[in-house]
């Protein structure tokens, strides 16, 4: 793809991309994944938060997914994904009255971009 941008932004590392990493893994013509979880854009980490409490963001959400599966007993992919999103928003509620670059906006962006690509009715680990 021809790069027509005049600024090399650190947000995209100066390279526009046509698809997210999760979709790339799923659509692979050499036998893609049956499902993927991941960010559709620039994923944030707790280090990107500005407030005194450095918790949340993508690494927190990933941990919540495995907590849903391993500790809460969510064995269906969509159920574990939805539970992780719900748990994250209960811990980090979004305040839509705040500025766009506050931590609450980062939390909103985190859950909006963390998508499940694939069949949500898949059982994690398969059937016996």
Task: Name every feature range the model reports, one short phrase each.
Residues 9-128:
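Active-site-proximal C-terminal subdomain of hydrolase catalytic domains
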């Amino acid at each position: 793809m021809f790069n027509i941008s005049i600024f090399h932004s650190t947000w995209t590392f100066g390279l526009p991309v046509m698809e997210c990493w999760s979709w790339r893994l799923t659509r692979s013509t050499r036998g893609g994944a049956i499902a993927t979880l991941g960010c559709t854009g620039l994923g944030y980490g707790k280090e990107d938060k500005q407030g005194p409490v450095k918790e949340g963001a993508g690494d927190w959400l990933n941990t919540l997914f495995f907590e849903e599966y391993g500790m809460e007993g969510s064995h269906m992919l969509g159920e574990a994904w939805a539970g992780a999103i719900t748990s994250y928003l209960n811990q980090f509620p979004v305040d839509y009255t705040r500025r766009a670059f506050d931590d609450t906006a980062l939390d909103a962006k985190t859950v909006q971009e963390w998508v499940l690509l694939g069949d949500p009715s898949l059982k994690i680990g398969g059937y016996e």
